[in-house]
Each structure stands twice: as structure tokens, then as C-alpha cells.
């Protein structure tokens, strides 16, 4: 990271929110020479107004001053310099036609002079958006990939009598919870334990039949080797990860699935899918396995998960090797130092150095 000159002015980056854990971690640890401050925008959610355009458009009120705004998925309406961090599609008006005047307005804002940079959280997100943004007149020099940072923890020490597998994510069915349940039941190993942190909700993307939902809930409730926490503070999730043996989430739809990265931060081998940014996060065969899920049946995915779990259970040396591989993978892409060095360049360019 470039050094700041003595006596240089601290510059304020106004952020829209830091509700997710990774945002709290990253925005609580700004690059040198900058500070993050929460800006006030119109709180549509408090008024229970759930309009896609309003939810993903930011108009900051003049209660606090910032040198630059940094939003997460939100197009800024203010006549003020801003950068936007993008995890999936942009503009984030999923149900809106590209011919809609509001959609066209958002593209003009992204191409306009006030938008200084589009920061994609993965190459996958950049690839998804690049062509239509270029067609809208967005300067390709504005676009870059800056990965999230993850906090790292030492393992707490595993339970020698059990092999603990963790799943975390409220969108249980979308994130591959059913396939993990099937795999766990096939495992048939008395030392295996499954810890699920989830509200078991059906959120978006995957809509299982009622009998599948009923089977999952019944299986979880009746198996004494499965523990369910519907709500758990994040620090407790991390505590459980640090004492576990494996994290599994073969999600079907996700732009990033940050819990995989958080599991890696605790030194866990991971079994995940090849969806979204995950092939950029995990390394197949190095710190776990990245499984294809498209055009495969639930049974086929479950069968492969079972095989990989058995492989790790029967090979302690491989388990240790895969867990230890996380440190270098994170060091290459997902540290605060890497993120903040890249953000410093973006912020400096946006503010004229």
C-alpha cells in the first residue's frame, strides 16, 4: 500500500451500509488515509416500501459530508463523486425491462462523470455485466475486480471422537441443504455429526416441492446426530466453524456465497459448487472440492458429496493438508491488505490523487 505523506488530510468515504458481516469487517478497517462514515439516505425499508428501483438507488441526504460515496449495489442519484461495489447484475433492477426509462437512467448514471468506478467482487460478476455496460457507454477503465476480505482465525481443536460437518445459510434449499442431508444419511458413520445453522427458508431461485420441505424438516428433527440452530450470532457461527472438520454448501444460485470464504478463514476444508464466484474462492482438490451442479440430479450431487466426506474422514493427513491450504489462498486474494491497497488506488483516482 502506498505511504501517505505526513500531514495529509484524512478523507471521508461515505458508505450506504455495513449490515453483512464481511461489510462490517471491511468497512471497519479502512485504507490508510481514509475513514468510512455511514451516510443517511432515504429509509424506504422503514416505511415498508419495497420497490426494486428505490431499494437499489441511493439518494444521500445532506446531513454529513463525504469526499466520495461508496455504495453496495446501489446507483447514486446525487451529483457527487461515487463508486459502486457490485456482486451480481448491474443495475440491480432484476424484474425491470432494459427498455424502462428508470433502467436507462441507471445506465446513464453508471456511464456518467459522477460514477468514478465499478468495483466487482469477482471476475464472474465482471464477466456477467461487462458487455451490456460497455454497450451503454461505461468506460472499461472504470471496471475492476476487488475481492472481499475475510477475517482469519486459528482452529480451536477438533473433537477426536466425532467428525463435524457444518452447513450455514438461511436459504437452505437454494444452498444445497437437501443434497447435504441426503449425503449425510447415506454416510452411515456413527462418528459423523451435522451442524446446520439455517432458518430453513425457501427464499429465491430454488422452489422445492412441499414433500421435499417436509422430508428435510422431518429428517433434521428426528436424527440425533443432526443439530439445528435457526438463529445464531455470527461469533457463535465462527466458534463452531473453528471446532469443526468440514464445511459443505453446494449452492445452486449465489453470486458469491460468503460463508464458504468465512469457513476457509477458520481453516476448514470446503465442499462447494461451481456457481458464481466460488471457483475463484475455493480451489478444487487443494482446499476441498468444487462440484458441478448444473444438469445433475439431486441424487448425483448427494452421491459425490458422500464420497468426498468419506475421503476426508478416512484420510486425516488430507484433511489437515486441505485445511492448511486456506492460508495461502486467502493471502493471495482475500486479505484486508490486498483489498485496501486496491481500494486506495481507486479512491485516489476518483478524488484526483
Where are these regions (language model features)?
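C-terminal "capping" alpha-helix adjacent to the active site of nucleotide-linked donor transferases
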Residues: 295-320
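Short alpha-helical donor nucleotide-sugar binding micro-motif in glycosyltransferases
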Residues: 231, 239-244
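Conserved donor-binding/catalytic core segment of Leloir-type glycosyltransferases
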Residues: 157-186, 194-197
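A short, well-ordered alpha-helix in the C-terminal region of glycosyltransferases
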Residues: 311, 318-333, 342-345
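Short hydrophobic beta-strand element within catalytic cores of glycosyltransferases
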Residues: 269-272, 279-282
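A short, active-site helix/loop in glycosyltransferases that binds the activated sugar's phosphate group
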Residues: 112-142
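Nucleotide-activated donor-binding/catalytic signature segment of Leloir-type glycosyltransferases, i.e.
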Residues: 198, 208-235
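Aromatic "clamp/platform" in nucleotide-sugar-dependent glycosyltransferases that forms part
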Residues: 252
Amino acid at each position: 500500500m502506498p505511504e501517505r505523506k505526513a500531514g495529509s488530510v484524512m478523507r471521508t468515504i461515505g458508505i450506504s451500509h455495513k449490515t453483512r458481516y464481511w461489510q462490517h469487517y471491511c468497512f471497519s478497517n479502512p485504507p490508510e488515509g481514509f475513514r468510512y462514515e455511514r451516510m443517511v439516505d432515504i429509509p424506504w425499508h422503514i416505511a415498508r416500501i419495497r420497490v426494486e428501483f428505490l431499494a437499489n438507488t441511493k439518494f444521500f441526504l445532506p446531513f454529513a459530508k463525504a469526499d466520495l460515496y461508496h455504495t453496495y449495489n446501489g446507483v447514486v442519484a446525487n451529483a457527487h463523486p461515487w463508486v459502486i461495489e457490485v456482486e451480481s447484475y448491474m443495475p440491480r433492477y432484476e424484474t425491470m425491462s432494459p427498455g424502462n426509462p428508470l433502467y436507462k437512467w441507471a445506465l446513464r448514471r453508471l456511464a456518467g462523470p459522477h460514477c468514478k468506478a465499478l468495483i466487482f467482487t469477482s471476475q464472474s460478476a465482471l464477466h456477467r455485466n461487462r458487455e451490456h455496460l460497455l454497450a451503454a457507454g461505461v468506460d472499461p477503465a472504470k471496471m475492476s475486480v476487488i475481492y472481499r476480505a475475510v477475517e482469519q482465525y486459528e482452529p480451536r481443536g477438533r473433537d477426536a471422537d466425532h467428525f463435524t460437518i457444518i452447513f450455514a445459510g438461511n436459504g437452505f434449499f437454494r444452498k444445497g441443504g437437501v443434497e447435504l442431508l441426503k449425503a449425510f444419511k447415506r454416510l452411515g458413520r456413527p462418528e459423523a455429526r451435522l451442524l446446520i445453522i439455517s432458518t430453513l427458508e425457501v427464499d429465491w431461485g430454488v422452489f422445492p416441492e412441499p414433500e421435499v420441505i417436509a422430508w428435510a424438516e422431518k429428517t433434521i428433527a428426528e436424527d440425533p446426530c443432526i443439530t439445528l440452530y435457526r438463529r445464531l450470532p455470527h461469533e457463535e457461527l465462527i466458534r463452531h466453524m473453528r471446532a469443526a472438520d468440514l464445511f459443505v454448501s453446494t449452492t445452486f444460485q449465489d453470486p458469491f456465497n460468503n460463508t464458504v470464504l468465512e469457513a476457509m478463514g477458520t481453516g476448514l476444508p470446503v465442499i462447494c459448487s461451481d456457481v458464481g464466484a466460488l471457483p475463484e474462492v475455493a480451489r478444487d482438490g487443494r482446499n476441498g472440492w468444487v462440484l458441478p451442479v448444473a444438469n445433475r440430479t439431486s441424487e448425483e450431487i448427494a452421491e459425490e458429496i458422500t464420497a468426498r466426506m468419506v475421503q476426508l474422514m478416512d484420510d486425516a493427513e488430507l484433511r489437515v493438508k486441505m485445511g492448511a491450504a486456506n492460508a495461502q489462498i486467502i493471502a493471495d486474494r482475500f486479505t484486508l491488505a490486498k483489498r485496501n491497497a486496491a481500494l486506495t488506488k481507486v479512491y485516489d483516482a476518483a478524488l484526483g490523487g
